[in-house]
Curated annotation (Swiss-Prot):
GO molecular function: DNA binding; DNA-binding transcription factor activity; metal ion binding
Name this protein carries in UniProt: Cadmium resistance transcriptional regulatory protein CadC
Superkingdom in the source lineage: Bacteria
Record: residues binding Cd(2+): C6, C10, C57, C59
Species of origin: Listeria innocua serovar 6a (strain ATCC BAA-680 / CLIP 11262)
Gene behind the chain: cadC
PANTHER family on file: ARSENICAL RESISTANCE OPERON REPRESSOR ARSR-RELATED, HTH-TYPE TRANSCRIPTIONAL REPRESSOR CZRA
BP-aspect Gene Ontology terms: response to cadmium ion
Keywords: Cadmium, Cadmium resistance, DNA-binding, Metal-binding, Plasmid, Transcription, Transcription regulation
DNA-binding residue intervals: 58-77
Lineage: Bacteria, Bacillati, Bacillota, Bacilli, Bacillales
Purpose of the protein: Metal-binding repressor for the cad operon. Involved in resistance to heavy metals, such as cadmium, bismuth, zinc or lead. Metal binding causes the repressor to dissociate from the DNA.
Quaternary structure annotation from Swiss-Prot or TrEMBL: Homodimer.
Domain HTH arsR-type: 23-118
Database matches in Pfam families: HTH_5
Length: 119
């Protein structure tokens, strides 16, 4: 017998209805898309690097994540569309920086979760 599933079917309608009501107002596609973008290791490395540096140019970021400038640029574009990073041009160089510092809280939460729960 599997102890991880119910042995009988019993629907708790009040709880199910409350949960469904809350879910109807939850923007699942956007939140899922946000986590999907951040689930890529290179994008996570980029965010981590930018959290610890005020700004980095694309060439520096490419070197840090050991990827081509084109690949790095693609990752940065995804992060920029998500509102995590922004950029500015200085002469011939394009610098990226963290746009919303709340991403730092999310990074810390991920690290703490891993250390406390997954250890």
């Amino acid at each position: 017998m599997n102890n991880e599933i119910c042995e009988i079917t019993c629907i708790h309608e009040d709880k199910v209805n409350r949960a469904k009501s809350k879910l109807a107002n939850f923007d699942t596609p956007s939140v899922s898309g946000f986590f999907k973008i951040l689930s890529d290791e290179n994008r996570l490395k980029i965010v981590h690097a930018l959290v610890h540096e005020d700004e980095l140019c694309v060439c520096d970021i490419a070197n840090i994540i050991d990827a081509s400038v084109a690949t790095t640029s693609h990752h940065l574009n995804s992060l920029k569309k998500l509102g995590v990073v922004d950029s500015h041009k200085d002469g011939k160089l394009v610098y990226y920086f963290i746009k919303n510092i709340k991403i730092l809280n999310l990074m810390e939460l991920g690290v703490n979760f891993k250390e406390e729960v997954l250890a």
